[in-house]
Regions:
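Glycine-rich flavin
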Residues: 2-114
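Residue-level signal for inorganic ion chemistry
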Residues: 64, 142, 211
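A generic structural signal for well-ordered coil/turn residues at beta-strand boundaries
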Residues: 75, 90, 118-120, 138, ...
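Short helix/loop capping segments that flank catalytic or ligand/cofactor-binding pockets
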Residues: 89, 114-116, 151-153, 179-182
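Short loop segments at secondary-structure junctions
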Residues: 99-101, 127-131, 146-149, 173-181
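DPxDG-like acidic metal-binding loop motif
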Residues: 107-146
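Glycine-rich beta->alpha junctions and the first turn(s) of the following alpha-helix
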Residues: 154-238
Length: 315
């Protein structure tokens, strides 16, 4: 069992109030010495969170480190993919242009960059201008420190759920970085494509760990608490699997159904808490669990097809 999960079963289940992003980030950084690896950090961060928003932020940062192991634990980062048209390869209009002096010029705009307003480094997805022929554009990821000349971050309106977690519009005009800022490998196949799977795994780990702490603190039924633990073990194990593999995607689809059932089972427990602020936040933030549901269903369907099997009927 992941040592971080053992800690969740033994530590006092009270969490301190987290005031803002800076306060959460200080707490998350402090977990590094006691949480070895991205899955452990997702669990530890979720358990320490006083609400779903900070659990989500913890899972998101853990997912980035699972995707990019060289990313410093002490650097708040944001993955900049989505643009005005969406996040598919053909939607990416941001360009990365190699210059004669060996530098790279980045131009474009991103939207809904999670934790963007508070990040110290942005991981920006763009198409190589020299490879703009027919077919899927060649995407790369550039690591850009904040601030950098030519980079402007605009805070976007809060979302209706987890409004504590800020998002940014990222504007790039004649932004220049060294060629060494490019991460190795294809930007889509190595980073964008697997990130949804990795993010689903680590954000769910964090939210389940948050719910486990609340269940212990509120002395909710043992069967519910034990199911949370079992599901955390399941997701912790899945987080070690190949994020590209169809078998991982099929198993993740089933695991997410189990997690969502637990979220539904938690609803009457929160309702019984009355006007408790934590319960009211949970009701508000529950919409987070339905985001990208269609994309997850499509991922599972494609996984079955890649396995040469007919997808099961039903949801």
């Amino acid at each position: 069992m992941n040592p971080a999960l053992v800690t969740c079963l033994q530590a006092a289940p009270q969490a301190r109030t987290i005031e803002d992003v800076a306060d959460w980030w200080t707490l998350w950084r402090s977990l590094g010495p006691i949480a070895d690896g991205p899955a452990a950090r997702a669990i530890a961060g979720g358990f320490a969170a006083d609400r779903v928003g900070w659990a989500f932020a913890s899972g998101y940062q853990a997912a980035l480190r699972a995707l990019m192991p060289d990313l410093s634990h002490d650097t708040l980062a944001a993955f900049c993919v989505t643009e005005a048209q969406g996040n598919r390869p053909r939607d990416i209009r941001t360009t990365i242009t190699p210059l004669a002096d060996g530098m790279l010029r980045i131009d474009g705009a991103k939207r809904w960059t999670t934790l963007g307003p508070s990040s110290a480094v942005l991981l920006i997805v763009g198409g190589l201008a020299e490879a703009s022929g027919a077919g899927r554009p060649t995407l790369r990821v550039a690591q850009v420190p904040v601030p950098t000349p030519g980079l402007v971050l605009k805070v976007m309106p809060p979302t209706r759920f987890v409004p504590e977690v800020p998002h940014a519009e990222v504007l790039m005009q004649d932004l220049r970085v060294s060629a060494g800022a490019l991460l190795p490998g294809d930007g889509y196949d190595r980073y964008v494509k697997p990130f949804r799977t990795i993010e689903d795994l680590h954000v769910t780990l964090a939210v389940l760990a948050y719910l486990l702490r609340e269940a212990r603190a509120r002395r909710w039924p043992a069967v519910f608490t034990e199911q949370l633990v079992a599901t955390l073990v399941l997701f912790s194990d899945l987080a070690t699997e190949d994020a590209h593999a169809p078998t991982t995607h099929v198993a993740l689809a089933g695991a997410l159904h189990v997690a969502h059932r637990l979220y539904l089972d938690a609803q009457p427990l929160w309702v019984a808490a009355g006007d408790d602020p934590a319960g009211m936040r949970w009701q508000r933030d529950a919409a987070l669990f339905e985001v990208a549901g269609t994309a997850r269903w499509q991922r599972a369907q494609r996984a079955w097809e890649r396995l040469g099997a007919e997808p099961p009927d039903g949801d």
